[in-house]
Amino acid sequence: MAQGQQPIFILPQDTSRYVGREAQRINILAGKVLAETVRTTLGPKGMDKMLVDSLGDIVITNDGVTILREMDISHPAAKMLVEVAKTQEDEVGDGTTTAVIIAGELLKEAEKLIEMGVHPTIIALGYRNAALKAQEILEEISMEASDRDTLMKVAITAMTGKGSERAKEKLAELVVDAVMQVEEDGEIDKDNINIQRIQGASVNESRIVNGIVIDKSRADTSMPKRIEKARIALLKYPIEVKDLETDAKIRLTDPSQMQAFIEQEEQMIRDMVEKIKSSGANVVFCQKGIDDLALHYLSREGIMALKRVKKSDIKRIEKATGARLVTNIDDLTAEDLGEAGVIYEKKIFDEVLTFIEECRDPKAISIILRGSTKHVAEEMERALEDAIGVVASTLEDREVVAGGGAPEVEIARKLREYADTISGREQLAVSAFADALEIVPKTLAENAGLDSIDVLVDLRAAHEESPYMGIDVFDGNIVDMKEAGVIEPQRVKKQAIQSAAEAAEMILRIDDMIAARGFDVSSKDEEDMEGMGGMGGMPPMM
């Protein structure tokens, strides 16, 4: 700049900025810290985290996505890895911790290459090619899953180490039965399996319901508490007189007009109840409100009614009973009604529930999940949701892989062979990708109190003979995971590797960060960030 010229500012005052290597270093640091946070939770011997929010509410879990969701993370690069975990949870239901620690390790390996002088673009290209090759290798080592026994093994593997050890076989039975029941044309909608979590009893008292359970009671205590041979009407229409949609006013000039007006309203409600009765319905689930007078008339007709039922519950009742949701009560006919053998209200512990049972081939069902305390029941529910996700994935794809770190070691071994066929610096990136994948067996060993280096060396040697060799964290031996029954859906590994690679690639391609005013911390916080302080913000952009 020539002498005497004024500097030109193109960004608002107090905006912070990092450029080039500094931006990459900060983002990689954030990714590594986040991965280290959840790393200790991986595997059957993984530890739990206690998360306490500003209100003092406690969550105790080793579920990766739950930990990341509950943490107050605002660092942009760390948020990208949280999205990886959420995507993994939505797509598969398990493997969230695996996805995050692989992404963190990919960034760690990339940092070494950047320090060696390898350009981030070359690393990103190498990672992309390595991820594609990893998917091919995964297909080669996958096994076909076609029977109930395989589904049981998948469910048990998913729940091992998640607080459900004492009853994992029983819970696996419930999960497999539930998923197989709701399957339609080879597809499973996990929303059709409803888990009702109730504390106050042993997990062994959990059971599956051949129908739906909703956490609602009768709209009026004078209504029947139990209905046999239920004929079910589902209404989106409120059973009450609608308010005027305009600001129009009704002017009454004498008391008789007021009386006529009231009588007219009552007649409209009587007509609605009569419409329900004439359709043959003896149970009504209404998504909207029900007028007190309507409740009186329904009760007098011996009809059970529940009001303000959640939309998700209405959908499940449709799937379970064959009922059709009616948006206008005048259109309600006998053809719209669903059927159930019995509907009854029951109080369990401190919750009043309505059971819709003995449904004919229901495509939506409920699981009553018990737990001795609130926190135990919550962790059981997370384990059950993971198991439902992996069993559904297995049933849809019919492809599984061995567990215990076996797929990662085998993919890493073959990626190194693939790297030898590539020339240039991209070869280093593919080799780094292979090294990063071995973080999974290393972490499994560390969390079990074993020597990770010895375990990894033994695993590599064992994989010269078989691709199914993995680590048995309970006795520390290298065993055939296929024979041991430790198996996972192929989709879990596929999604984890793909998501981790894409997230790492995206972070590596960032060479400029501009933070708005107020989104900044002092440089001394960078040391805190290494120990998980400072994850709420970004180090300064000089």
Curated annotation (Swiss-Prot):
The keyword Metal-binding does not apply. The keyword Chaperone applies. It comes from the Archaea. PROSITE patterns: TCP1_1 (PS00750), TCP1_2 (PS00751), TCP1_3 (PS00995). SUPFAM superfamilies: GroEL apical domain-like, GroEL equatorial domain-like, GroEL-intermediate domain like. Keywords: ATP-binding, Chaperone, Nucleotide-binding. One of its GO terms (molecular function) is ATP hydrolysis activity. Pfam families: Cpn60_TCP1. Molecular chaperone; binds unfolded polypeptides in vitro, and has a weak ATPase activity. PANTHER family: CHAPERONIN. Belongs to the TCP-1 chaperonin family. Forms a Heterooligomeric complex of two stacked eight-membered rings. This is Thermosome subunit alpha. The lineage of its organism: Archaea, Methanobacteriati, Methanobacteriota, Methanomada group, Methanobacteria. The gene is thsA.
